[in-house]
């Protein structure tokens, strides 16, 4: 069977529904619009049956779809940050004096994969200040620390091992991970933010299966945030072929032999054929938008502000920005 690469729970549900023409038992789906043009979708996987069908762990997956023009409008960026913060706050059940560790996953030398390290560079980190300047830093300010541990190819160390060692040493009460994701739809690239309470498997979307970073491996809650920055080239080619076929079917005379041939094409076999044709020439090619540098800069700011607001509930965004500047 032709498997589409995606890290997004909302897309896994769409693929299942399209393939079997029914909803998934053990999965609850809820969709709402919270701000103008900002849509929030909750996908709750309730049991093992739902987890098996979705190929994802049991838990909540929040998907925030943002307008296309977000990256060029500072006001919309702040609105999205507040929506991200609100979604995070629903998943974070942590007293304000408890410590949070934020981990920016990814390779800072590869732009589509640099979103995690970029977010870390924009965070309000306070753990050291609480120790160095206890008289100046208010008790209502949460101790937050952050790290961008790089990737296995740079450090020679599994990212999960680095984080596990840090957790054992500094003993945070919560880990928040940020990583780049893969999508099956080009229109979702850089326009979707996924938040989950199930942890993360770094690099899974592009076929690199590393040590999982979750509550089971670390012993504390793990919240994962991600933004799709790449799409599998075979998926783009397959979608383009679908558009061509649909248009040819619309133009053909219903009931005629050519119409029946087009209508009976097995889309699963077509997907496998396209992948097998592309593999010798491009391998596992992933595609990203040409404006990815600007996109990563704006999305990292949105996510960083969302995390800052969620982890510092006693501060408003204006005060956080003053602190950072």
Curated annotation (Swiss-Prot):
Its EC number is 3.4.24.78. This is Germination protease. It comes from Clostridium perfringens (strain 13 / Type A). GO terms for biological process: proteolysis; spore germination. InterPro entries: Pept_HybD-like_dom_sf, Peptidase_A25. Homotetramer. Belongs to the peptidase A25 family. GO terms for molecular function: metalloendopeptidase activity. Initiates the rapid degradation of small, acid-soluble proteins during spore germination. Autoproteolytically processed. The inactive tetrameric zymogen termed p46 autoprocesses to a smaller form termed p41, which is active only during spore germination. Residues 1-7 form a propeptide. It catalyses: Endopeptidase action with P4 Glu or Asp, P1 preferably Glu > Asp, P1' hydrophobic and P2' Ala. Keywords: Hydrolase, Protease, Zymogen.
